[in-house]
Amino acid sequence: TNQASVPPAIVALCAKGIVRDNQGGAMLLPTLAHTMIPRHEVAVFSGPSFADEVFSGLPAALVAAGKESATKAIQDAFEGSNLRVYRNTDTVGVALAGAMKNVIAIASGCAVGLGLGDNAKAAILTRGLSEIARFSSVLGAKSDTVFGLAGVGDLALTCAGPHSRNMAFGMALGYGEAPSGQLAEGSRTVAALA
């Protein structure tokens, strides 16, 4: 489609990950989206939620990160009796935390699959959160983001059990099984960070 014929729109980016750029470096998905659709306003929509629970009417809280106009539009469109949408300007922090927690969930799942116990899982989560905070600091993200819904909240949910694709992927690896079904987002992020 000719992009000039598409009116500017607000894009709520729900995917989480880090990809390789053309120079072999790493790029957050919002940065990639800005390069691919520069006329559109891109915001990151993330946080601790499983879509099936939200659709079932169970309570959840998410973060919309981006420019004020975009986050307000997302909040107005999605907030309801069971979903609270918080607004934030820290696109980098929300995107980075969302991507990195998937890698940590895979590692946590591996620990479960290998039978390493809850102590090892707790160590992986804690040290993983430390890594998210370090990367966030280097990239200019806000520390509040790391310790909010998009960071700790999403990390806790994603590492809670096999309902998470990334956790299930890691568990399968730990059990020595070939992961089945859809490839977990975190596996691509691992490759981009390697």
Specify the residue positions occupied by each region the protein language model found.
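Catalytic cores of large soluble enzymes that bind and process phosphate-bearing ligands
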Residues: 25, 66, 117, 124, ...
